[in-house]
Amino acid sequence: MSRFFANGSDSESESSEEEVQASNFNKANNFQFSDDEEEVKRVVRSTKEKRYENLTGIIKTIRNHKKIKDIPNTLSSFEDLTRAYTKALPVISKEENGITPRFYIRCLAELEDFINEVWEDREGRKNLSKNNSKSLGTLRQKVRKYIKDFEEDLARFREAPDQESDVDEGEGEAHDSDAERAGADSDGGIGAGTGKLAELPKAAKLVPTKVAADEDDSDDSIDWDSDTESETESSEDENLYQNMRERFLKRTTEKEDKDDDKRKDKRKEQKHKVRKRADDDEDGEWETVVKGNVVEKPKMFEKDAEIDIPLVLAKLVEIMSARGKKRTDRRLQIDLLFELRDISEQHELGTPISVKIHFNIISAIFDYNQKISEPMKLEHWALLLEVMQSMLKLLLANPEINMNESVAEEHEEYGAAPYFIRGCPLAAVERLDDEFTKLLKECDPHSNDYVSRLKDEINVVKTIELVVQYFERCGSNNERCRIYLRKIEHLYYKFDPEVLKRKRGELPAAGTAPSSVEVMDKLCKFIYAKDDTDRIRTRAILAHIYHHAMHDNWFQARDLVLMSHLQDNIDAADPSTRILYNRMMANLGLCAFRQENIKDAHHCLVDLMVTGKPKELLAQGLLPQRQHERSAEQEKIEKQRQMPFHMHINLELLECVYLVSAMLLEIPYIAAHEFDARRRMISKTFYQQLRSSERQSLVGPPESMREHVVAAAKAMRCGNWQACANFIVNKKMNTKVWDLFYESERVREMLVKFIKEESLRTYLFTYSNVYTSISIPSLAQMYELPLPKVHSIISKMIINEELMASLDDPSETVVMHRSEPSRLQALAMQFVDKVTNLVDVNEKVFDMKQGNFFQRGNMGNRDRGYNRNQNNQGGNWGGQRRDNRNQRNRNQRGHHKQQQQQQQQQVQTIEEE
C-alpha cells in the first residue's frame, strides 16, 4: 500500500489497535464516498423546494424576456408559469396555509406593469411586428383574466412593494434547506467526527449580515475576508479528517458555502438599497435628464438691469424667436414665459404687456405637442384653460385694450390708451375647442376618464362665452359668426326639457332665463343675415333644424329643410358638413315618428338605412373593410372625423324606428296589391328581413329587435293587432328602444294606436273578397277603436279607391262590391302574363343563337353567304327553315293573344251575370 493512503497522523507512538481501527475506517470511507471521485454530490430535495425552484426559474426567464421585449416568448413563459403554479398549489396549501408566495405576486405585478407600459406606448405598438402585436394582445387578455384571482394579494403588494426581491428570497430559502440537508447527510454519513459540519450552516443563519457603510464596497473585500478566515480555520479542518485521501478529495466545503452566502447577502443588500433609492425618488418630482452636460437655466435679466416695457418686450421676442426651431426646449420656453409674466406683474408694467405674455404662453403650449393629430397632455390642457380664461378676463376688464390679428407688430401700443396688441383670441379658442374634441376621442367612452374630460366642457363653454362677449363689443361680423358657430356646436345637440314644459304651459314663459331654443334662434338668425361664407350658414341651418327636431318642433324643422334646399347641394359640401346633414336627417326622422308622421319618418331615414352603413354615415365608428378598400392614411383621416361618444345617436333606436315605420306602410300595401306582379317595394331593407324570415323552415321566438319587428309584421298580415302590439311593445323592447325617448309612455300609446289602424286596413284588404258586407260596430269592437275613427278609415279607403265598397249609414255596414277579380281569376291572369313573357324571352334567345340578327342582302357578309351557298349546293335550305320557323312562331303568338282576349271576355261576362 502506498504511504499516501497511510494514516494521516505523524506521531509514531500510536498503538497497533489504532492502526487497525484506522484501516477499517479507511475501507468504509472508500466504499461510502466512491461517488465523490466523479465529482457528483447527491442532494435529496423536498417537493416544496422542487416546485419553488421551478417557479423562480420561470420568473427569471420572464424577466429576461421582458428586458428585450420578447413578447412571444414572454407569453409562452407565462403559460409555463401558470401551469407550474397549478402543480405547486397542493404544496402551497399545505406548507403556506394557502397563502400565495410573495415572489409570485411580485412577478404578476411586474408583468402587469410591463404590459400596461407597452400597451400605452401607441407609437411603439405601431412599430411592433405582426407576431409581437398579436402576442401582446393575447398576453394582455390572459394576464388580465388570470390576475382576477389575485386582486387582494396584488393590492396588498402594491401598498408595500419595497421589500426584498422575492425571487432571491425563494433562492435563499432553497439554499438554507440545502444546507440543512447537507448537514443532516453529514451527520449520517461521516459520523461524530464531522459533527461541526452540521452545525456550521445553522450558525451561519443566526449570524446577521453586516451592512457596509460605504456603498462602493465590492465582493473582493468579502473574498479577502473569507480567505483570512479560512487560514485561521485550516488547523481545525485538519483534525476533522482521518486520512490524507479524504482531505484532498474535491468537494463542496463549508468555506465555499459560507462565501456563497456572503455574496448572495451582499447582492440582496445592494438590490434593496437600489429599490429603496428608487422609491425615494418617486416621492419627489420628476426631472428631465438632458443628454450631455447639464445646461443651466438662462438668466432672465441682469442683476442691476432696470425692468421696463421695452426690455420685457425684447426678452419676449428673444424667447419666442426660438419657437419652431430644432432642439428647442419647449418646456423651458413655457417656464421662461411664466417667469417673464411674474416679473412684469411684480414691476407693474401694465395690463397690456401681461395680455401679450398670456397670448404667447398660449401659443407656446399649443406648440408643445408637435403632432397635431394627437391630443395634448392633461397637465398642459389644464394649464391652457387657466391661461386662456385669465387672458380673456383681462381683455373684458379693460375695454381700452384692442387685440386683433390685423394689428402690425410695429404698430403695437403698450404705453398709452388705447392699447393695440397683435393677436387673435378667436383662433386660440377655436384651437382650444379642437383640442377638447381630441381629448374626448382619445379616451375610452365607457371609462371614468371620459366622464372627467367631459366635465371640462363647462370650462370650454365658459371660455367661448367670454370670447363671445369680447367680440360682441369690438369684433367684426365675420368674427362674430365664427364664434357664434362654435357656441352653436356646443348647444345644438343638448335637450332642454324646460322647452316642452313651457310649450305645455307647465312653466311660466315670462320672468325666466331664455331657453336654448330662443338662444339658438338668436345666434342662427344673426348668421343667416351677416355671414358671407356658405359653410357657416349651412352648418348653422343644419344645427338649427337638429335643435328644433330635438324639441318636437316638427313643422319649423321641416320648413327650414324645404326652404333651404339643402338636399340639392349637400353633395358639394365638406365631409364634416355632410356628417352633420346625416345627423340632422336622422334626428328629423325621430321627430317625425314622435309626432305621428310615419311616412315622413320613413322618408327621412330611408337614405341612411338602405346603405347598411349608418354607423359610418353618422361618424360613430368605422366598419371593418378589406385590406385594399381603405388605406392607413384614409383610416386615420376618418378617425379624426368621428363624433365624440356623448354626441352619438343610438343606432338600434334608429333602425327600430325605420323598421316599424316600414312595417306600418309596407304590410297594408302588400295586402292591397297581393296579386299585382308589378308592385313596388316601399322599403327594400324591411322586405329583405321579411323574406329571409319566411324562408326559414323553423322560426323560434323573437330575441333581437329585428326579429320582434318581423314577428309583428307577420301578425299584422293576418289582422291580429294584439299579437302585433305585444311583439312591438314589451319589456325587452321597452328597455332596448322605447325607454330612450323623452316621453316614452306617449310614444308607446301612439304605436299601439297606429298598429290598430293599420291592422284594420290590412284586414279589410285581405278578407274583402270573403264578405258581402261588414258591420262597422263589430270592426270597432274587434280593434278597440272609436266608431268615428273606424268610419273615417273606411271612408278614406273608399275615396282613394283602395277598397271597392260603399257605406250604408242607416245599418252602419260596409257593402262590398265584386268588381275586382276573384283569387282564382287573379292567379290565372298572373299565370298568363308570366307564360307570355317566358315565350318572348325564349324566342329572343333562340334568334340570337341562330344568327337571325343579320339582315338579308348584307354586302359586308358576302364571304360567309358564299360559303354557305357552296355547302348547300346552291340552295338556301337553312334560310328557308328559319323563315318557316319564324312564321310559325308569329302564328303561335297571335293565337296566344286571341286566347287571352277570349279569357278576358269570359271574365267580363261572368262579372256582368
From Swiss-Prot:
Name by which UniProt lists this protein: Eukaryotic translation initiation factor 3 subunit C
Origin species: Drosophila virilis (Fruit fly)
Chain segments carrying region Disordered: 1-31, 157-195, 208-285, 856-913
Biased composition (Acidic residues): 11-20, 162-171, 214-239
Oligomer and partners: Component of the eukaryotic translation initiation factor 3 (eIF-3) complex. The eIF-3 complex interacts with pix.
Family membership noted in the UniProt record: Belongs to the eIF-3 subunit C family.
UniProt feature, compositional bias: Basic residues: 264-276, 887-898
Keyword annotations: Cytoplasm, Initiation factor, Phosphoprotein, Protein biosynthesis
Gene3D superfamilies reported in the protein's UniProt record: 1.25.40.570
Statement: the UniProt record of this protein carries the keyword Phosphoprotein: yes
Subcellular localization(s) per the UniProt record: Cytoplasm
Domain PCI as annotated: residue spans: 645-821
Record field: compositional bias (Polar residues): 21-31
Pfam families from the UniProt entry: eIF-3c_N, PCI
InterPro entries: EIF3C, EIF3C_N_dom, PCI_dom, WH_DNA-bd_sf
Listed GO biological process terms: formation of cytoplasmic translation initiation complex
Native organism taxonomy: Eukaryota, Metazoa, Ecdysozoa, Arthropoda, Hexapoda
Residues modified to Phosphoserine: 34, 165, 177, 186
An example Gene Ontology CC term for this record: eukaryotic translation initiation factor 3 complex
Origin superkingdom: Eukaryota
Biased composition (Basic and acidic residues): 172-184, 244-263
GO molecular function: RNA binding; translation initiation factor activity; translation initiation factor binding
Protein task: Component of the eukaryotic translation initiation factor 3 (eIF-3) complex, which is involved in protein synthesis of a specialized repertoire of mRNAs and, together with other initiation factors, stimulates binding of mRNA and methionyl-tRNAi to the 40S ribosome. The eIF-3 complex specifically targets and initiates translation of a subset of mRNAs involved in cell proliferation.
Coarse class of the protein's main subcellular location: cytoplasm
